[in-house]
């Protein structure tokens, strides 16, 4: 029986490449001249740490990072934007955790969408991925198209199509 897996993963090397391009853009932009701006990636904890002088620059930097991630093929939903910035002396800091894996609520939402579609497929939750099996590949492709059109709150990738 054909099947595929639904996951939410961010390739750390691709993320690092996107951040390197963002750093290079910030150093060449006129409005960031002589600014003490830093973008660091903690690969173990999967957190992007941004430090700059004021909140206006912080918003611009976050926009640059999201744009560069999109150009590298990383969905903006992979970043947890809920953490607000905080001040540390004259600097403003912000941590952007990178989401890896699908949480329980999103799994339930995805499975409900699949079951409500009426297709003859079976979703099964396995840790941080969802395996969808069906009798026809066409049914699986319909589910992929359906999930791409819906907003489930996480960046989804479809892998292991067999």
Swiss-Prot record:
Q: Which GO terms describe its cellular component?
A: cytosol
Which keywords does this chain's UniProt record carry? Answer: Nucleotide-binding
Gene Ontology MF annotations? nucleotide binding
Q: Which SUPFAM superfamilies match?
A: YajQ-like (SSF89963)
The protein's matches in InterPro entries, at most eight in alphabetical order, are given as: DUF520, UPF0234-like_C, UPF0234_N, YajQ-like_sf
What does the record give as the function of this protein? Nucleotide-binding protein.
User: Family per UniProt?
Assistant: Belongs to the YajQ family.
List the PANTHER family hit by this protein, alphabetically: UPF0234 PROTEIN YAJQ
Name of the protein this chain belongs to: Nucleotide-binding protein CHU_2278
Q: Which organism is it from?
A: Cytophaga hutchinsonii (strain ATCC 33406 / DSM 1761 / CIP 103989 / NBRC 15051 / NCIMB 9469 / D465)
Classification from the root reads: Bacteria, Pseudomonadati, Bacteroidota, Cytophagia, Cytophagales
């Amino acid at each position: 029986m054909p099947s595929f897996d639904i996951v939410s993963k961010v390739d750390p090397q691709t993320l690092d490449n996107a951040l390197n391009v963002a750093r290079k853009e910030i150093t060449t932009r006129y409005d960031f001249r002589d600014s003490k701006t830093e973008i660091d990636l903690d690969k173990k904890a999967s957190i992007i740490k941004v430090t700059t002088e004021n909140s206006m620059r912080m918003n611009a930097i976050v926009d640059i990072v999201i744009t560069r991630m999109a150009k590298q093929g990383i969905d903006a939903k992979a970043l947890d934007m809920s953490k607000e910035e905080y001040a540390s002396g004259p600097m403003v800091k912000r941590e952007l955790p990178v989401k890896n894996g699908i949480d329980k609520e999103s799994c339930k939402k995805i499975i409900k969408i699949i079951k409500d579609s009426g297709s003859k497929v079976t979703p099964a939750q396995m840790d941080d991925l969802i395996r969808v099996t069906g009798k026809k590949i066409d049914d699986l492709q319909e589910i992929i198209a359906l999930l791409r059109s819906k907003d489930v709150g996480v960046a989804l990738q479809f892998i292991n199509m067999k």
